[in-house]
């Protein structure tokens, strides 16, 4: 029988671009396609029978931007501009994040890119049972690694989606474990129209409410490159990380040892030992409620997505001031 090919359309070679200094980021926004069944980058240009590029974006716009709480000024120093298949994003050097979309002639968003302004370095995680892993020293979107600094918490993500959601930087720990109506982005409830990958691409700054998975009546376990939860994950065109990085599988978090309630309470997170002596800060940044405009357990609990799908959702690494586990 004839095998049907899966065609995945995308733009550029990564969804996140990080820089620590002022200047102009030049981002490839060539319209590509991939025939890979696992959504990996193949970078095949979309051309017509004459070899001319088709589906090119014609404009760019800033969907949101956020300067970190200890800085002043704008993350972007000027309006991003599209020149052919290059998106030019002027960055001021002020720490923070922005989401820039490229659009077609009708004004529809066809792709988007997370601009992340911060320094960063790599750490080596050594696990005697699971292997050695190279990991960035901070969460995606974080502009600090200092314990108890909200700038260290990073952005929020819905599993399988390529774009971040900004975090309010004025929430302080209180007796309440949930905070209502502080979310900074639009939202919509999943449906046959809304709960699709194509909707998330056109509306990257809209979070989708659901009772379980934002996908409507179906699930796609391979969006972050680990469809069966068993094999080593790969970087997909929906991966939210910078080039050279991808969402980790759960092996990367195995082997951590709970330290103490006092340490977690004092640091709003844990300093987990990653190689026998060196530590990495894991903040208790909380999470966005999947079905409401509600921020839950910020500075009480920490959650880290993995690329591994589960039976009803996806696995995440969970920790608080009492224990740590996978759920």
Predicted segments with their positions:
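C-terminal, surface-exposed recognition/capping segments
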Residues: 142, 202, 207, 211-327
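Short, compositionally biased
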Residues: 2-235, 310-313
């Amino acid at each position: 029988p004839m095998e049907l090919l899966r065609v995945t359309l995308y733009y550029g070679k990564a969804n996140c671009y990080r820089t620590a200094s002022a200047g102009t980021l030049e981002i490839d926004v060539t319209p590509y396609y991939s025939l890979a069944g696992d959504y990996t980058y193949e970078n095949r240009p979309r051309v017509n029978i004459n070899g001319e590029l088709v589906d090119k974006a014609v404009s760019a716009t800033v969907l949101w931007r956020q300067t970190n709480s200890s800085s002043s000024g704008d993350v972007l120093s000027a309006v991003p501009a599209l020149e052919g298949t290059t998106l030019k994003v002027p960055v001021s050097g002020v720490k923070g994040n922005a989401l820039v979309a490229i659009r077609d002639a009708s004004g529809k968003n066809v792709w988007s890119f997370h601009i992340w302004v911060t320094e960063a370095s790599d750490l080596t995680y050594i696990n005697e049972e699971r292997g050695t892993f190279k990991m960035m020293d901070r969460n995606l979107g974080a502009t600090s690694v200092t314990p108890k600094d909200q700038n260290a918490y990073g952005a929020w993500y819905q599993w399988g989606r390529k774009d971040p959601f900004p975090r309010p930087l004025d929430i302080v720990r209180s007796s309440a474990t949930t905070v209502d109506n502080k979310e900074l982005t639009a939202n919509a409830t999943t449906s046959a129209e809304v709960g699709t990958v194509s909707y998330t691409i056109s509306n990257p700054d809209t979070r989708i409410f659901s009772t379980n998975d934002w996908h409507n009546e179906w699930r796609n376990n391979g969006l972050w490159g680990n469809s069966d939860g068993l094999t080593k994950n790969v970087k997909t065109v929906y991966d939210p990380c910078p080039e050279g990085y991808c969402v980790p599988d759960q092996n990367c978090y195995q082997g951590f040892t709970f330290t103490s309630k006092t340490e977690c309470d004092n640091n709003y997170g844990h300093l987990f030992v990653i190689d026998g002596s060196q530590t990495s800060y894991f903040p208790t940044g909380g999470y966005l409620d999947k079905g409401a405009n509600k921020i839950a357990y910020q500075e009480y609990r920490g959650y880290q997505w993995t690329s591994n799908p589960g039976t009803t959702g996806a696995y995440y690494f969970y920790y608080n001031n009492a224990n740590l586990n996978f759920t």
